[in-house]
Swiss-Prot record:
NCBIfam families: nuoB_fam, PRK06411.1. One of its GO terms (molecular function) is 4 iron, 4 sulfur cluster binding. It is a peripheral membrane protein. [4Fe-4S] cluster binds at residues 63-64, 129, 158. NDH-1 is composed of 13 different subunits. Subunits NuoB, CD, E, F, and G constitute the peripheral sector of the complex. Keywords: 4Fe-4S, Cell inner membrane, Cell membrane, Iron, Iron-sulfur, Membrane, Metal-binding, NAD, Quinone, Translocase, Transport, Ubiquinone. It comes from Escherichia coli (strain K12). This is NADH-quinone oxidoreductase subunit B. InterPro entries: NADH_UbQ_OxRdtase-like_20kDa, NADH_UQ_OxRdtase_20Kd_su. Binds 1 [4Fe-4S] cluster.
Amino acid sequence: MDYTLTRIDPNGENDRYPLQKQEIVTDPLEQEVNKNVFMGKLNDMVNWGRKNSIWPYNFGLSCCYVEMVTSFTAVHDVARFGAEVLRASPRQADLMVVAGTCFTKMAPVIQRLYDQMLEPKWVISMGACANSGGMYDIYSVVQGVDKFIPVDVYIPGCPPRPEAYMQALMLLQESIGKERRPLSWVVGDQGVYRANMQSERERKRGERIAVTNLRTPDEI
């Protein structure tokens, strides 16, 4: 290997070669350990496995379910998020996706299936009908599935696009990564800590207010 030295500016005060800088050499063993050993908390590792291996339980009630199934095609490839394994039994699933209109007669069935799911479990409400009843403001339609089961992520739209469903999966993965659950038996008041996730509306509020040049419909 050839080494070359560069002089300092000859017009300067010092015409000597520059002195070499002293560098701290790290231990080679420490470098190899950092490359081959995963450092972290057990809770974070468990959450990492949970959020990347979600098993959804498809509970399609209306047209929103068609958009959900579309996300499983090769065009969208929901397998990138580890949520392509649909389960026909709630006992083998940890995510319930309520897609469509929830009627009053269907609410007890959804409640029973949700109770049959083992912990940890999450719920995604997909579409305007599942969120708030949609345009069916009548006695036979439940005005939102959150009236009888807890909902983690809401997907707006009538019906929402497959991209919206995949964004909901990413938001759910982010929420799962911040959860804190007991790793053993639950004693006393120990429960599940869920981070207070900011809604997309609030998160994008500042960005939308800052917009000055609005695009025409032809430019969108």
